[in-house]
């Protein structure tokens, strides 16, 4: 894409020794914004695919526990930067299910990104599996203690470009409002669901 063609030369310029500190800082900001735009473009394309009639995912047996651990590790540094307690709870035995690994990873990534972005002090993710031997039935639950999303917004936030935005103590969060819509569509393509819980003490997605 054109954004990818912009990102490459930017990275090359940043690596040059003769670039002064002020210019390098500006270039890094440009690179970060380019990456955000690239990520948004990819998410929009993915969302359009999931909404296309006849679109299907290919499923294969996947180590769900492994995906959760890997994704948790990817967000650990960002959570630490924000001073968050960032925990993962999984059964002792690895759990396998037939999923589309790439799509499943996107769902978890979006939920954790959302949690880390809005949380005040903690983000918790857990894997719940049935006692019966059912390799396609499980639940992922994420919780964060950000500003509580009101009941009237708990369905609205799953619509494209709808984002709950509340200023508190002068803090403003930014986002595109596409991640949750994409995650729900991908969950539904797995014959699953994605919704917000009714709890008032935290924001729960499962």
Where are these regions (language model features)?
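Conserved catalytic submotifs in the C-terminal HATPase_c
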Residues: 58-63, 80, 85-95, 130
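Short conserved segment of the HATPase_c
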Residues: 149-161
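Short acidic helix/loop segment immediately C-terminal to the autophosphorylated histidine
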Residues: 14-21
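Helix-loop junction within the histidine kinase core
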Residues: 48-59
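Short alpha-helical segment of the dimerization/phosphotransfer core of two-component systems
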Residues: 32-37
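Short alpha-helical Gxxx[C/S/T] motif in the catalytic ATP-binding
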Residues: 174, 179, 183
């Amino acid at each position: 894409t054109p954004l990818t063609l912009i990102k490459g030369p930017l990275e090359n310029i940043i690596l040059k020794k003769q670039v002064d500190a002020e210019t390098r800082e500006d270039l890094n900001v440009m690179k970060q914004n380019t990456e955000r735009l690239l990520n948004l473009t990819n998410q929009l394309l993915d969302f359009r695919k999931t909404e296309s009639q006849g679109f299907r995912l290919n499923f294969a047996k996947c180590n769900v526990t492994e995906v959760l651990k890997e994704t948790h590790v990817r967000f650990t540094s960002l959570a630490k930067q924000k001073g968050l307690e960032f925990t993962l709870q999984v059964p002792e035995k690895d759990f396998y299910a037939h999923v589309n690994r790439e799509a499943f990873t996107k769902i978890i990534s979006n939920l954790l990104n959302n949690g880390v972005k809005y949380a005040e002090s903690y983000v918790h993710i857990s894997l719940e599996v049935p006692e019966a031997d059912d390799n396609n039935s499980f639940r992922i639950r994420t919780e964060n203690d950000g500003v509580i999303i009101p009941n009237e917004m708990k369905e609205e936030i799953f619509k494209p470009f709808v984002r709950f935005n509340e200023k508190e103590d002068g803090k403003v969060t930014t986002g595109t409002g596409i991640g949750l819509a994409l995650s729900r569509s991908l969950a539904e393509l797995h014959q699953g669901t994605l919704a917000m819980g009714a709890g008032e003490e935290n924001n729960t997605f499962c």
